[in-house]
């Protein structure tokens, strides 16, 4: 297994729990990136910037997401979404925000 600082976690979904998961991943020493297909609130953008957590909104950069060692997925993102199907097909572990926090 990779050391924590090189273990790549992508958080899919930038709502309250997604931003919380990104902060937790960073606090645990992981290399974290947050991606949201929609727009983030200004509050969440500010939190991510303050903590120097890279993020994107309005898109999912497939190449970056598929390179993750683990995905923390918002429950609002269905498993039938093509990107999630690709992640499952390549064997990338996908866990919920609640699982990650426990």
Can you say where each PLM-predicted feature lies in the sequence?
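N-terminal leader/targeting and accessory segments in enzymes
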Residues: 1-96, 100
């Amino acid at each position: 297994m990779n050391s924590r600082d090189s273990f790549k976690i992508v958080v899919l979904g930038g709502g309250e729990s997604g931003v919380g998961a990104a902060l937790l991943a960073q606090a645990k020493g992981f290399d974290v990136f947050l991606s949201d297909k929609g727009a983030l609130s200004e509050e969440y953008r500010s939190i991510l910037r303050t903590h120097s957590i890279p993020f994107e909104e309005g898109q999912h950069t497939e190449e970056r997401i598929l390179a993750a060692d683990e995905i923390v997925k918002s429950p609002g993102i269905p498993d039938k979404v093509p990107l999630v199907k690709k992640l499952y097909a390549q064997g990338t572990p996908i866990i919920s925000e609640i699982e990650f926090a426990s």
